[in-house]
């Protein structure tokens, strides 16, 4: 009867075990950063659809108001044309304006339905849900910090963080590949029990030692593996450099867009007052026979355009502000994304 037991415990393997753990830890962190970046992108899409939905609803509201006054003008012009006070051409112009308003309403209503569907789908709501955006959401929203450079983006962007962790994982992979150039050292132990009837009996024989092994074929082939690992590391570094350049451009554009929206707030507010006063003057002149229908309709269109621009400017600033936060990696710090 014979019984044997042997065991080998590696004590050195070219740091491959240590670096393999580092690879997995860094890849895990890269995946977590990518997940956070995806959440930020989804949040920004929700904000975009939310703002576009409000803009569509507000346009419809203002167009319907304008449509009522335009339809009333047509009724007045019909009577004036019957009495020979205005030419038929003026009546046709007023009717054409009503038709244009209706076409705009139809187009915006279609866009409204599409945007609403996109948003409820993204939010996992019932497809039949009709969302109504409150104007106060845009009028009362608070601006906390305004980024003025790309420093925060370099620190906070999760897509950049993911690439950095991938770079660390690639560095560890290079070390793993180079680890095959080293021998494997292990502590080897054994136990033997031997009983040959009437010949020999060995009980509790134990041995312990150190084993060193080299795989020469692996060493000869390992140069290619090392080069591949190094090329992967360079590729990740290049991707990181390209992303940093893109982030800097994106941040600068977002800063400029936000500043422009603030300037537009002032201009559109002034334009609203100017267009209202212009329409009042033109209407007064028209009633006194000092201006024609073209002037009246043009002033009406300008006033409508000013109303729309002024009504949407706060929503535009709201959108540009959150785009700036997203570009600088601060969007997730502004609110919490949750799923019930």
Per-region residue spans from a language model:
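Small/polar (Gly/Ser/Thr/Ala-rich) solvent-exposed segments
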Residues: 8-37, 161, 180-206, 213-227, ...
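Periplasmic alpha-helical coiled-coil/stalk elements that build and connect Gram-negative outer-membrane
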Residues: 41-154, 254-257, 261, 303, ...
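Amphipathic alpha-helical coiled-coil scaffold segments and their short linker/junction regions
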Residues: 125-190, 334-340
